[in-house]
Amino acid sequence: MIKILFICHGNICRSPMAEFIMKKMVSERGLADRFHIESAATSSEEIWNGVGNPVYPPAARKLAEHGISCSGHHARRLERSDYDRFDLLIGMESYNIRNMMRILGKDPAKKVCKLLDFAGGGDISDPWYTDDFDTAYRQIEQGCAALLEHFSAEKNIYS
């Protein structure tokens, strides 16, 4: 089983969008049983009294436009123990990577990367600040498709 953790600042926009887009992609290809996919935050800003906030409503609406439900999701913070639990820890932008490394400490197995590293590089724009959920969705979808293609080539997930 391939275990993926998508990470952004608050775990209410980009990383849950990536989580649920990727879940849909693997499900549509009959691969859901070969993947375990979650998301987390580098910050605890969206977690109050131990309970994480749900997906930010505009992000949830953007997912719903594409037939993707994110119900039941609540923000959670990245923990050092996640490094051992997941095969890949995927940030959305360079700042996420910096903050992930502050939490994780080190990356000896080279598990930490950005989503768009699989699609030519770059950062996923943060719709929390830009209010551009269309661009964020497109970038995340492109990155997830490239990630799935990477696993298809590297791990022969279809056999």
Where are these regions (language model features)?
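Phosphate-binding/catalytic loops
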Residues: D82, L88, S94-S159
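Conserved active-site segments centered on acidic
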Residues: M1-D84, E149-S159
